[in-house]
Amino acid sequence: MAEAALQTGARANVSRQFYFAMALTCLVIAVLGFMPTYFMPMAQGKFRGPPLVHIHGLVLFAWMAFFCTQTWLVARGKTLAHRTWGVLGVSIATAMVFVVTAIVSWRISQASLPGQPEGLAHGVRAFAWVSIGGLAFFIGAFALAIVEVRRPETHKRLLLLATISLLGAPIARWFLTLLAPSA
């Protein structure tokens, strides 16, 4: 009986560590994805963009940091702190809806201005579906995770899926910047 309880506890700990490792992996993917198009140009003083771009980055990276923190709290057995801070996740997720919608709308309007290279508006609109599609999935999975908050196994899986759905844009940037043919 005691051995079975120990094995169950060990499996639960491995599961908690898995979700923390996955959260860190998502954060690393996001950072690496935006390294060539945002972080490096910012560090070199070459990035030019309106405040909305910085707000967008701040809010979405806030989610990634929040998700890492939440999974770390659970992995350390600090469930009460996890639940207390959980309300902040709803605020960040709500902000994400507005900021992603605003940045996608802004990018499309900028690409559609007269004098832009031919085909740019089409490319930006096509890429917008990556952001909007990821956001739509995030909203659905996040809402279901809130509904399933009393079922930890379902709750954590839905939040991981929601977070993974946000990785389309940073992963696409690997292809757009690192693997794109030379101009």
What is the predicted role of each segment?
Residues 1-183:
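Alpha-helical membrane insertion/targeting regions
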